[in-house]
């Protein structure tokens, strides 16, 4: 197969993919069906932290009252 023929086949594949994807996007109204059908109890409504109501997490106590010391920066190009 020559280069011209391969390019023509490539264009046909791109065109066919575009034509197939346009109607499916209209049918879904531009939204992701998976997100719309997600069970509400699986979506977290509050942010849980290690100092909140999750006692099983491994969290240092200094994170609860913001007294943790910052880690020293490593030497390197990005830290100038």
From Swiss-Prot:
Judging by the UniProt lineage, the source's domain of life is Eukaryota
Q: Where in the cell is it found?
A: Secreted
Task: Give a GO cellular-component term.
Answer: extracellular region
Which UniProt keyword terms apply here?
A: Amidation, Disulfide bond, Glycoprotein, Hydroxylation, Ion channel impairing toxin, Neurotoxin, Pyrrolidone carboxylic acid, Secreted, Signal, Toxin, Voltage-gated sodium channel impairing toxin
Q: Which residues are glycosylated?
A: 45
As given in the record, the signal peptide range reads: 1-21
Q: Please give the function described in this protein's UniProt entry.
A: Neurotoxin with probable activity on sodium channel. Induces intense repetitive firing of the frog neuromuscular junction, leading to a tetanic contracture in muscle fiber (spastic paralysis). In vivo, shows the same effect as the whole venom when injected on fish prey.
What protein name does the entry list? Conotoxin SmIVB
